[in-house]
Amino acid sequence: MALPEHLQRHLEAGRALTAAGGYRGRFAPSPTGLLHLGNLQTALLSWLAARQAGGAWLLRIDDLDTPRNRAGAIEAIQSDLRWLGLKWDGPVLLQSERRGIYHSWLSWLRRSGRLFACRCSRRELADQPIYSGFCRQAVHNWGWQRQRLPSWRLRVADDDPHGSGDVVLRRADGFIAYQLATVIDELSFGINDVVRGADLREALPAQRSLFAALGEAPPRFRHGPLLCDASGQKLSKREACAGLKPLRDAGLDAAAVIGRLASGLQLVAPEARISATELLEHLTQQAINAVIS
C-alpha cells in the first residue's frame, strides 16, 4: 500500500535535514519527575557530542504517557538545562503535540496488514524476553478475553537479524508505544546520531526492526554510562530524586555541577569547576567518543 502524501512529506522533510549534512542529535527526557544527576550526565554527554561535531542538538519531551507525567516537570527540565548552560536548538518538541502523526502511521501500517492485535496479558508476557508470536500465529478462541482491549504489534519475521520479536506500536491502554513515537520522531527531524543512557540499549532491537519495516536507515545509536546510587541501582525519577535542588541549596553553582558530572564520566579531575562551554573547549571528539559505546 502506497504511503499517504502527508506521511511522505514528513519523511522527505526529515531526509532533507539529514541530506543537508552535519550532526543532528537530541536529548529526549520524559516529564515523570525532576531530572536527576544521571539524566543530566546523559544530557551533558549528548550535548558535548553534538557541539564538538559542530552539529544541532534538539530537546524533545517524551510526554505521551500522560498518567505518569508530573505537573511542572517540563518547565523544570528546561530550567535545569538552561542553568547548566546546555542550550538546545529550535523550539522544544513535545510528543503530545504529535499524536496525530503517530496515529496516522499506525493506521497506515494497520491498513497495510503489517500489524496484528495481541490480547496477551502482562502476566502471560512476563516470562517472554522476546514475544513468542502467539497472537500472530493463529486465530484463537479467546472467550471472555476478547473483551480485553488489544495492543497492536508489528509483524517481525522470525529470522529478523535484530531479534526483537513482534514490536508493540500501540499499547492495550490506547497509548502510542514509545518505540513508534521515537522512530517516527527520529525520521521526522532528521536525527542521525543518538547519545542516550545505557539502560535504553535494550530498546535497540525493536527500534531497528521498525526502521527496517519502514525502509529507512536508523541513526547511529550510542550509549553513555549510567549513574547509580550507593546500592548500585540506577537512579530513578519515580523514586523522588530531588534533582539539582539540594546542590543549588548547598551553594553549588553550575560550574561545580558540570565539574561533578564530567568527573563522573572521567572527563575531568574530581572536584573540578568548569562551565559547559569551557568543558567543550577542553575536550576532543576522541575523548568524548571514548565514554560512549
Swiss-Prot record:
UniProt: Zn(2+) binding residues: 118, 120, 131, 135
InterPro entries associated with the record: aa-tRNA-synth_I_CS, Glu-Q_tRNA(Asp)_Synthase, Glu/Gln-tRNA-synth, Glu/Gln-tRNA-synth_Ib_cat-dom, GluQ/Sye, Rossmann-like_a/b/a_fold
Motif ('HIGH' region): 29-39
This protein's record includes keyword Zinc: yes
Protein name: Glutamyl-Q tRNA(Asp) synthetase
Cofactors (names): Zn(2+)
Cofactor notes: Binds 1 zinc ion per subunit.
Annotated motif 'KMSKS' region, positions: 234-238
Annotated ATP binding sites: 237
Originating species: Synechococcus sp. (strain CC9605)
Cited HAMAP family: Glu_Q_tRNA_synth (MF_01428)
Residues bound to L-glutamate: 26-30, 62, 178, 196
Gene3D superfamilies: HUPs
This protein's UniProt keywords: Aminoacyl-tRNA synthetase, ATP-binding, Ligase, Metal-binding, Nucleotide-binding, Zinc
Keyword Nucleotide-binding: yes
Stated role: Catalyzes the tRNA-independent activation of glutamate in presence of ATP and the subsequent transfer of glutamate onto a tRNA(Asp). Glutamate is transferred on the 2-amino-5-(4,5-dihydroxy-2-cyclopenten-1-yl) moiety of the queuosine in the wobble position of the QUC anticodon.
GO MF terms, alphabetically ordered: ATP binding; glutamate-tRNA ligase activity; zinc ion binding
Record-listed E.C. numbers: 6.1.1.-
Entry GO terms, CC: cytosol
Residue stretches spanning the membrane: none
Family as reported in the entry's similarity comment: Belongs to the class-I aminoacyl-tRNA synthetase family. GluQ subfamily.
GO biological process assignments: glutamyl-tRNA aminoacylation; tRNA modification
